[in-house]
């Protein structure tokens, strides 16, 4: 049938870890532990969605971080420096990712709704396999069990913004056409991943990295603050090319109904 057959979901900030705090906090700690260099949470969020080694590399190229690094060491960050920060990052992330494994509000019900419509649930992450092997069973204990998952270091071709993790889900799930898939993500590299794979793309403006608030903080925010943060996040996701932007995964079934209507009319991503 000419309809959506699969969704490929990101993890942190999309299905678990409202606000995507597990990786951002660990980047701050890893820079401090490896080289006694301070970075802010806001800086740590900028390259979110990339593989973690590539994320550290991108952080080193941020003008503010590069200026601090140059002031301390008199040179730009090297590949060996990135390796050292990554070596500090990995055990910290593996140790703490389970603490951020609870599904975001609405995720479990949304997955049930999608499966009732015959939609398969794929997933992929900027986390490496060593982290995912801790996160996946922890999320399963909370009730979130996708049909397939791919880690950023699983494939020789690489991770985001390339299409390969999303396409590996297509293969594993046996989907007949990429136009029958939706890639859902809270960060720009994940939107690019979906577009490069030829899929429909949905950005999440409130639950994830760009909004950047904990669930408790979000619950107590003024409507004005929410609106400003939502607009900031949505603008970045639309700029990345997202076909749709909604607040969280709870809004996805309505979007899929809209996409199905477009597919029925012969439209493609």
Swiss-Prot record:
The active site is at residues 10, 52. Keywords: Hydrolase, Magnesium, Metal-binding, Schiff base. GO terms for cellular component: cytosol. It comes from the Bacteria. It catalyses: phosphonoacetaldehyde + H2O = acetaldehyde + phosphate + H(+). Binds 1 Mg(2+) ion per subunit. Gene3D superfamilies: HAD superfamily/HAD-like, Putative phosphatase, domain 2. Its EC number is 3.11.1.1. One of its GO terms (molecular function) is phosphonoacetaldehyde hydrolase activity. It is an enzyme of class 3 (hydrolase). Its cofactor is Mg(2+). The keyword Nucleotide-binding does not apply. Mg(2+) binds at residues 10, 12, 186. Belongs to the HAD-like hydrolase superfamily. PhnX family. Involved in phosphonate degradation. This is Phosphonoacetaldehyde hydrolase. It comes from Salmonella typhi.
């Amino acid at each position: 049938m000419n309809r959506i057959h699969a969704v490929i979901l990101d993890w942190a900030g999309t299905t678990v870890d409202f606000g995507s705090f597990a990786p951002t906090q660990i980047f701050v700690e890893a820079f401090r532990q490896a080289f006694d260099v301070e970075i802010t949470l806001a800086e740590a969020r900028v390259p979110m969605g990339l593989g973690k080694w590539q994320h550290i590399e991108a952080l080193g190229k941020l003008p503010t971080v590069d200026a601090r690094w140059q002031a301390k060491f008199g040179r730009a960050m090297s590949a060996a420096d990135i390796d050292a920060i990554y070596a500090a990052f990995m055990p910290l992330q593996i140790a703490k990712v389970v603490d951020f494994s609870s599904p975001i509000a609405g995720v479990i019900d949304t997955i049930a709704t999608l499966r009732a419509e015959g939609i398969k649930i794929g997933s992929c992450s900027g986390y490496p396999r060593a982290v995912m092997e801790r996160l996946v069973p922890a999320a399963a204990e909370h009730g979130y069990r996708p049909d397939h998952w791919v880690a950023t270091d699983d494939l020789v071709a690489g991770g985001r913004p390339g299409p390969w993790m999303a396409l590996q889900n297509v293969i594993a799930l046996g989907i007949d056409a990429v136009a029958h898939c939706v890639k859902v993500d809270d960060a720009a590299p994940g939107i690019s991943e979906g577009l490069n794979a030829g899929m429909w793309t949905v950005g999440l403006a409130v639950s994830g990295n760009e909004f950047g608030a904990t669930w408790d903080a979000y619950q107590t925010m003024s409507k004005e603050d929410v609106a400003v943060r939502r607009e900031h996040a949505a603008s970045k996701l639309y700029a990345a090319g997202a076909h749709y932007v909604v607040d969280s995964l709870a809004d996805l079934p309505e979007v899929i109904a809209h996409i199905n209507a477009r597919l029925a009319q012969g439209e493609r991503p």
